């Protein structure tokens, strides 16, 4: 199973992402053959197959592998090394390769027991995005506890906090909307095509300063403190790409700075470590959190 094409492509991407300075053709081919051998699947990697695989990394995975003639090596395009798509591909592949070493799901791998996350819609939505076709579906609104019919132009699939969303806009509208896949039902692709000037760069820019999926707030400088334990968690798994996390002078906690939109999702993230978090600035955020905690105390006494 490991010797199929998609596995070879992902092995190459993994090798190049771990060796950003680049690898020679010989090094890549030997590493691929070694990977197969470890899985008891001997594979004789031919030069022609290698050349085809390098080309197919771009065609099938949308990633550019550059040949550096001066140093006689191959590298991932520098613009894509930190791409979250690469991380998604490789993380999925690492789980996959661990699983195929066993006949079926081994007992020592324990997945989280949670309800469906809507991934059954993933391929349908992805195909509609590629074909630029409208989608129509029923959507459950949490705030009003009702189902509404939605018709959208789908532009992208975006992951946030272990949930997937389809990003798009309504017909004759240009403002971006996000719809959780886990709240979608009766999904159908319509025959109607759409045109748009919105691209992935536009969408990435739209969410650049936000945490999770809420947007449309102004960007502010936020300073917070955590104790040592929570600070280490936040340091290892940053809240936002703008995060700067520094150990305080006493080495008893962390000072964290962010440049971010203060949205409901961000506030909920701060509340998830309520026993430790201390907001330094802005003052309105400090007061807002204090009010939430005061109201919670009233409800729970």
Where are these regions (language model features)?
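Short, basic/aromatic recognition patches that contact phosphate-bearing ligands
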Residues: 1-88, 295-301
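Core beta-strand-centered patch of the WYL/Sm-like small regulatory domain
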Residues: 4, 109-223
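Short, hydrophobic/amphipathic alpha-helical patches that form generic packing surfaces
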Residues: 7-15, 92-95, 269-272
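Residue-level signal for tight coil/turn positions that link beta-strands
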Residues: 69-71, 161, 181, 251, ...
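Polybasic (Lys/Arg-rich)
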Residues: 208-301
């Amino acid at each position: 199973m490991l010797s199929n094409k998609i596995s070879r492509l992902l092995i190459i991407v993994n090798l190049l992402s771990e060796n950003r300075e680049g690898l020679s053709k010989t090094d890549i081919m030997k590493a691929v053959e070694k990977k197969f051998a470890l899985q008891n699947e001997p594979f004789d990697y031919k030069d022609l197959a290698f050349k085809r695989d390098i080309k197919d990394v771009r065609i099938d995975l949308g990633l550019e592998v550059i040949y550096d003639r001066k140093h006689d090596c191959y590298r991932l395009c520098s613009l894509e090394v930190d791409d979250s798509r690469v991380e998604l591909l490789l993380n999925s592949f690492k789980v996959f390769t661990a699983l195929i070493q066993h006949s079926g799901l081994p007992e020592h791998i324990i997945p989280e027991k949670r309800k469906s996350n809507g991934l059954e819609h993933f391929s349908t939505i992805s195909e509609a995005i590629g074909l630029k076709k409208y989608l129509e579906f029923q959507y459950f609104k949490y705030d009003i506890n009702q189902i509404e019919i939605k018709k959208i132009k789908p532009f992208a699939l975006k992951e946030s906090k272990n949930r997937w969303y389809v990003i798009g806009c309504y017909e004759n509208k240009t403002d971006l909307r996000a719809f959780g896949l886990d709240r979608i039902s009766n999904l159908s692709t319509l025959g109607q095509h759409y045109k748009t000037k919105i691209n992935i760069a536009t969408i990435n820019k739209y969410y650049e300063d936000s945490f999770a999926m809420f947007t449309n707030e102004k960007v502010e400088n936020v300073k917070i403190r955590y104790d040592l334990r929570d600070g280490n968690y936040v340091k290892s798994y940053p809240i936002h790409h703008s995060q700067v996390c520094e150990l305080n002078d006493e080495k008893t906690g962390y000072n964290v700075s962010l440049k971010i939109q203060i949205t409901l999702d961000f506030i909920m993230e701060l509340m998830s470590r309520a026993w430790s978090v201390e907001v330094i600035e802005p003052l309105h955020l400090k007061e807002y959190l204090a009010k939430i905690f005061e109201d919670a105390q009233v409800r729970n006494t």
